[in-house]
Regions:
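Glycine-rich, phosphate-binding/catalytic loops in enzymes
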Residues: 20-26, 55-56, 210-213, 237, ...
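Membrane-interface soluble catalytic domains
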Residues: 103-104, 111-112, 122, 136-139, ...
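Structural recognition of the beta-strand scaffold that forms the well-ordered cores
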Residues: 3-7, 14, 70-71, 86-88, ...
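Active-site His/acidic residue clusters
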Residues: 21, 141-145, 179-227
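Metal-dependent active-site segment of extracytoplasmic phospho-/sulfohydrolases and closely related
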Residues: 3-8, 13, 59, 217-264, ...
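Active-site-proximal alpha/beta segments of enzymes that process anionic O-linked groups
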Residues: 15-28, 36-188, 295-301, 313-321
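Short acidic, glycine/proline-rich loop/turn micro-motifs
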Residues: 19, 99-100, 205-209, 282-284
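Solvent-exposed loop/turn segments at secondary-structure junctions
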Residues: 9-14, 76-79, 93-94, 133-138, ...
Length: 335
């Protein structure tokens, strides 16, 4: 099974797929408490907003109709850096050290992303990542979350693409990323791919989740998702390739815009799953609710990646220096 993970930044599930969210009790409230340091002044707030008068995400709805929508709950701080670091590496904020969008003090070098874990499981694997937010893929930025793996880049085995066309803000960058990603997916069919789009988050910050602009942004990225799914659907139709398509988000938005704290509307995420080529793999069919750090392990298990282990009697990864005391003159240790 090949994997396409699509990350839609800042999407409110209760507005994109209101009927499905309302029908699942696991979407109503977080399954674990938030960090009190990031408590919202007004408390957790309302659980749901006012659904749009007409559907805004037909592609997501079609994917869900042929697959399933799983609740995912983010752990505050509900910002993009901590959110994507957790979603893409399968680690908590404490483990990866990402607490802010500045990535100060991160430990991402020891927290490999989903694509790198696929490669580690089988070094023949071809991987691809494209992102509107450079911090996820660009080594010159504060991250990146996705490991660079330059040796694999040289031979085209690992490809990274960051959107640079900001002439129309994230909207133009999203179009650029989608165009590149759809071409690679359709013509090269990597074994695992991640595509990030940020237009909805930009709209949420500009006008808030209660605005017409926010709903229009959801519709725009939904159309981008359709292009990406079409790219791999053609490979399934012509080549018989089996594809697992997954869609997720890193946080929601308040009605007035913004996120970062522990309101229900910003902590709620989702994992939309759809398989081209058969029923969902058993590990995914049994899911009821996830936390952000459980998304990558669930997807890896579904495509056949098993966690590696190192069995040793020493503490791995710890740097310890010898004391500057000189030799003991014990002949057993003189060489």
């Amino acid at each position: 099974v090949k994997l396409l993970l699509i990350g839609l930044d800042g999407v409110r599930a209760d507005l994109a797929l209101p009927e499905l969210v309302a029908a699942d009790p696991a979407f109503a409230a977080p399954d674990h408490p938030g960090d009190p340091r990031f408590s919202a002044p007004g408390g957790p707030g309302a659980a749901f907003g006012t659904p749009p008068a007409t559907p805004v995400a037909p592609t997501l709805a079609r994917l869900a109709a042929g697959g399933r929508l799983v609740p995912v709950w983010m752990t505050p701080p509900t910002d993009s850096g901590p959110g994507w670091a957790s979603l893409l590496t399968g680690t908590t904020h404490e483990q990866n050290g990402v607490w802010w969008n500045e990535f100060v003090g991160h430990r991402l070098a020891r927290c490999p992303d989903l694509l790198s874990q696929v490669f580690a499981a089988d070094p023949r694997a071809r991987t691809f990542a494209a992102s509107t937010w450079p911090a996820l893929v660009d080594a010159s930025g504060p991250g990146p979350v996705v490991h660079q793996r330059p040796d694999q880049q040289v031979g085209g085995q690992h490809q990274l693409f960051a959107g640079t066309d900001v002439s129309d803000g994230c909207r133009s960058a999203d179009r650029q990323v989608t165009t590149r990603a759809a071409w690679v997916l359709n013509h090269e069919g990597p074994d695992a791919a991640f595509v990030h789009l940020e237009g909805v988050d930009e709209a949420g910050h500009r006008a808030g989740a209660a605005s017409a602009g926010y709903l229009a942004a959801i519709s725009a990225v939904d159309e981008h998702v359709r292009h990406l799914v079409k790219a791999v659907a053609e490979r399934f139709e012509q080549l018989g390739e089996d594809w697992l398509v997954a869609v997720t988000t890193d946080h929601g938005h308040r009605a007035e815009g913004g996120h970062g704290e522990d309101e229900v509307l910003v902590r709620r995420s989702f994992l939309l799953l759809h398989r081209l080529g058969g029923p969902l793999p058993a590990p995914l069919a049994a899911l009821t609710s996830l936390r952000s750090e459980q998304v990558t392990p669930a997807l890896l298990a579904a495509v056949g990646v098993r966690p590696a282990s190192l069995e040793t009697d020493h503490e791995v990864g710890v740097v310890r220096d010898v004391a500057p005391v000189g030799p003991t003159r014990d002949l057993r240790y003189e060489w």
